[in-house]
Amino acid sequence: MTTTFERQGDIAVGSEAKPRRAPAAALAAGAVLCASALAMHLRGGVEDVEFVRRVEATPDAWLTGHVFMGVGGILLLLGLVALPRLVQGRGRRVVAVGVTLAAVGAASSALGDVAHGTLAYMLVGEVPAEQSLHIQERLYSQPLLVAVSMPAMLLPLGMIVLGAGLLYSRAVPRPLALLVLVAPIAVQLGYMVISLPMPLMVLPLVAAMGWLALLVARGTQTGR
C-alpha cells in the first residue's frame, strides 16, 4: 500500500513509518536504566586507592549500577535503530550517522561497564585496595579491552549528531530535537562538575528518549 504525503514547506505530514512498539519500549527502558545507573555511579577520580575504597564500601550498589548500564546500553541500541524511520528526506542521512555512532557507542559502553563493574566487584574483600587498583589498571591497559571500550565515547557524540539531524529534518518537534542535543552535554557536565546533582542532569536523557519512544510506538512524524 502506498502512503501519500501532504507537504507544508519541508515538513512531511504523516509518515510511512509503522508503529514499532518493541523498539519504542527498548528505547524508553534503556534510557531509564542508563539514567538510573548514572545517578548511582560514584563520581571522582577512578585512578586512586580512595576511589577503590569507596567502591568497597558499597559493592552491591556498584555492581547494580554497572549491570543497569550494560542492560540499558543494549536496550538503547535496539531502540535507536528504529529512529531513522521517523525521518523522510531532509536530514535523514545526518540522523542515520548519529544513530550509527550512538549505537556503536552504546554497545561498547554496555560491554565495558559490565566488565569494569564485575571485575571491581569480584576483587572486593579478596585483595587489598592497592592491589585491586593495580589489577584493574593492568587489565584495562590491554589492547583488546582498550579497543572494545574506547568506542563508548561515540555514544554522546552520536546523540549530538542525532539531535542536530532531527533539528534539521523538522520531522519531530523542535523542543524534542533540542532535548536530544542537550542530553549528552548535561550528563558530561554532571561527571565533570561534582557539585551538580546527577539525578537532575540525567532528566533530559530520560525525557528525550521517552518522547522519541512515543513517536516510534505511534509510527508518526509530527514536524515542529
Predicted features along the sequence, with ranges:
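Hydrophobic, aromatic-enriched alpha-helical segments typical of multi-pass transmembrane helices
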Residues: 2-224
